[in-house]
Amino acid sequence: SSDVCSSDLPQVDEVLVVCRPADVDAMSALLPQEKVSFVFGGKTRQESVQNAVDTIDDCDLLLIHDGARPLVTRDEILDTLHRAEETGAAATGVFVKDTIKVINDDYEITDTPDRSQLIAIQTPQIFRFDLYKQAMEKAKAQGGNFTDDCKLMENLGVPVSVVIGEYTNMKITTPEDLPMAEAILKAREAE
């Protein structure tokens, strides 16, 4: 997100963009040059984040954000950052709108969790750097592949605080997502 890379976020000292080697030139053309470096991704999300973490000598907080969520707002970033400063681990999320069902291997419903206790976790996810490194080391020792950074912290026994975000901080992963993203951008421009 351009907000994460923005120079009007003085709390962010450095931005590491994790991408494929073939995408560096295209990404470089889109992003501001100051504060931004590129790191090659791995085979999994966890490996990609590990590649980035390995390039960092030391920092207070590690902010992890999905490039597929370009509509994150400055307020969401700052609110999550402030919560992580207080608690050591925080993530942005929204309450689920749909009723969620648990199914078995035969696609039969086996349970209905209480929707009021379900959050769809988004990014940014922000953690104390020392805690995150411990969580990565533990996961590596266990041989687990975690698709979510909050789960790494849960595995370490560290509670993660949730900051209620915006539904507009959507993940753009399919062609059907693009018209919605365009509508959000147009609405923001009109404000």
Predicted feature residues:
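Conserved donor nucleotide-binding strand/loop of the catalytic core
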Residues: 32-45
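Short, small-residue-biased leader/transition segments that mark boundaries at the very start
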Residues: 1-6
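Conserved alpha/beta core of the MobA/IspD/sugar-nucleotide pyrophosphorylase nucleotidyltransferase superfamily
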Residues: 118-191
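Short, flexible, basic/aromatic active-site loop/helix in glycosyltransferases
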Residues: 101-127
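Conserved beta-loop-beta/alpha segment of the NTase-like Rossmann-fold superfamily
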Residues: 45-105, 122
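Acidic helix N-cap motif at the loop->helix transition within catalytic regions
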Residues: 23-30
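Short internal beta-strands
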Residues: 16-20, 93
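Residues at the starts of beta-strands that form the adenosine-phosphate
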Residues: 13-15, 88-89, 159
